[in-house]
């Protein structure tokens, strides 16, 4: 092959390579699109908060900081000063959060779910500890943290509202009452807390013929009894009542009570002395 033919072939190859590069660059530039272009092509349709029309494409919508969306026609008519007091004006992440007032909380029925989600144990021993939280002594040895005991949740119904107490699995009845007094903010000297059990729906169905009856007080033999040993149903909340303790009378009332008892004793002795049997026994009567 002559040198002229080789030169012509090399020119053809270089021309083909340049044309292919141009085609590839044009296709890549066509594929490179911005987020706005993608949003328009995906046909996002949102409703304008003013005219309530469905607007297709994000470029045709104006989003305020409070989370409202307006079309390009209604957006200039909305003064942004009026949107500073919106409920969602704090941040876009809090746009769907609302505070719940106590009036909106419905009264709890006291029935717990059977899936075990509300009755599950808190496994304190299986919690993973971070490496940064492990303290080191002066010698460089790591200190081992004490094993956290397993916790158990106990549910109560107080004034138609649920009360939840977390205690160790080996907690006693005394521990439970101490926690309830602290939680309710009452003192054992002035108030008395009583617990009553109520039957679950399955137990009520089984005892239809024997009668349901009112909730019975919780039977506790000793304050040191473990809660796990008590007969507490896990499907119904325990009813929690707080009553004022009956105070004893004052010192004067106690004195009056003692004097009344003495007078009763004396009168009873006088009646016995005047009876015929006592006269017969008395030698002076003969």
From Swiss-Prot:
Residues 269-278 have a biased composition (Polar residues). Residues 243-268 have a biased composition (Basic and acidic residues). Residues 18-29 have a biased composition (Low complexity). Residues 1-38, 108-146, 196-227, 241-286 are annotated as: Disordered. This is Uncharacterized protein F10E9.2.
């Amino acid at each position: 092959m002559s040198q002229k033919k080789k030169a012509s072939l090399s020119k053809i190859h270089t021309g083909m390579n340049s044309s292919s590069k141009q085609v590839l660059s044009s296709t890549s530039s066509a594929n490179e699109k911005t987020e706005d272009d993608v949003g328009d092509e995906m046909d996002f349709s949102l409703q304008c908060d003013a005219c309530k029309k469905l607007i297709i494409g994000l470029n045709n919508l104006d989003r305020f900081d409070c989370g409202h969306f307006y079309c390009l026609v209604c957006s200039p008519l909305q003064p942004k000063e009026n949107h500073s007091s919106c409920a969602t004006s704090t941040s876009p992440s809090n746009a769907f959060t609302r505070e719940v007032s106590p009036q909106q909380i419905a009264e709890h029925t006291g029935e717990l779910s059977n899936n075990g989600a509300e009755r599950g144990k808190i496994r304190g021993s299986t919690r993973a500890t971070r490496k940064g939280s492990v303290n080191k002594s002066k010698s460089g040895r790591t200190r081992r943290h004490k094993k956290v005991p397993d916790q158990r949740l106990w549910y109560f119904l107080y004034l138609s509202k649920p009360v939840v107490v977390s205690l160790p699995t080996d907690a006693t009845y005394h521990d439970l009452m101490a926690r309830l007094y602290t939680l309710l903010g009452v003192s054992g000297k002035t108030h008395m807390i009583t617990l009553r059990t109520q039957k679950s729906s399955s137990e009520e169905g089984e005892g239809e013929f024997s009668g349901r009856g009112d909730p019975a007080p919780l039977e506790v033999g000793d304050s040191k009894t473990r809660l796990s040993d008590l007969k507490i149903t896990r499907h119904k909340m325990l009813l929690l009542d707080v009553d004022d303790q009956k105070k004893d009378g004052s010192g004067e009332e106690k004195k009056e009570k003692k004097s009344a008892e003495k007078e009763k004793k004396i009168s009873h002795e006088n009646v016995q002395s005047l009876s015929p049997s006592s006269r017969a026994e008395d030698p002076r009567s003969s």
